[in-house]
Amino acid sequence: MRQMALLPAIDHHAILPSIMNNIKRIVLTGGPCAGKTTALVRVIEHFSNLGFKVFTLPEVPTMFTQAGMNYLTQNPDFFYEGEKATLEIQLALEDKFLRMAEACNEPAVIVCDRGAMDISAYMQPEMWERITRDVGTTTQQLRDERYDAVLHLVSAADGAEQFYTTSNNASRNEPASEEGLRIARLLDKKVIEAWTGHGHLRVINNHEDFEAKIRRVIKEITNVLGLPQPIEEERKYIVEVEGEMPDCIESDITQTYLVADPGVEVRLRRRDWSGKVVNVHTTKKRVSGHEEIITERQVPNALYESLMQQADPYRQTIRKNRKSFIWKGQYFELDTYLNLPEPLTILETKGITEDEDVRFPPFIRVLADITCNKKYYNYNLALRR
């Protein structure tokens, strides 16, 4: 089995001190039978070897189920109290471990086996609003402000059905049958929707090689921690849409490039969907010919407007409509550009390995493969002509 290589030869001792006072809290979530348990073990091993103290918080609903909670109860009062207690313990665990991490003498990272918004996927929105109000918090605080990154592992029920099983989690309620697969896919979608809007939500595809899925998790956490990593190109295609698309998450995006030093790319992105707005500031810095450091942070509206004053005068703001969807276990983003001289629609894959085939949906007609074609980088599309 091919193992995840350690990071390229870099001076970790020079980098780790800057991470000491910037503890990251990361959610590892996903649909049923997505591979979270294995991923957590590998995350501990990999980042411990790099000098990190890795705290992995257990899945709270599983703890509650083992202690006697019945999430399928028909008693609404019992269900409400159980879900409210689940959220309270989830937040308390995270806060206590953050205090512990701050007291460590080495850099630390907190990885949560599911996070607060996962709880919302298993109830009606009205009950979730009541619970958050009674706990003294809001959806915006829990989804947008609490965690540095959310990594969603797609359920094996979507694209890797041959590996779907319930034997590794006795508390799992969806059976390993056609109906169970349907329920698992539905839960997978509901969890993604619950986290949609977080500035660093990443969907980790299913792969023919499960090891590739684990490598993707480690790569994304490496990115969140601000450690150098090899530069990789996601596959991109100019496409036309033919026929009806499946359920997708639709959003409008404005992307502005700011004035930056040579070798540094600074981007300000605003994403608007269903009346909600999230702003993300991203910096990409080359540290060698084949390595880069990417840092992302969510910014409030006031800071967004202030940073817009630093817009690169030689580049226009890119405006596009994005439809995000999963097809046969693979995650896609379909961007339709709205303010370019010529119509342009680009389909981008996420996390598909070089030796893996892209499973194009039947409603997509590929016109050209533009992977690695710098002409179609957003940074270059934004150039004023």
Describe each model-derived feature in a short phrase:
Residues I44-I89:
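Conserved substrate/cofactor phosphate-moiety recognition/catalytic segment
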Residues L28:
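Hydrophobic anchor at the beta1->P-loop junction of P-loop NTPases
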Residues P32:
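The conserved Walker
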Residues N70-I110, G115-A116, A121, P125-E126:
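Conserved nucleotide-sensing/catalytic segment adjacent to the nucleotide-binding pocket
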Residues E145, V203-N206, E211-A212, I218-R385:
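Phosphate-end processing signature that detects enzymes handling 5′-triphosphorylated RNA
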Residues A39:
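Hydrophobic positions on the alpha1 helix immediately C-terminal to the Walker A/P-loop
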Residues E126-E193:
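A glycine- and Lys/Arg-enriched "phosphate-lid" helix/loop adjacent to the NTP-binding pocket
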Residues K36:
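Conserved lysine of the Walker
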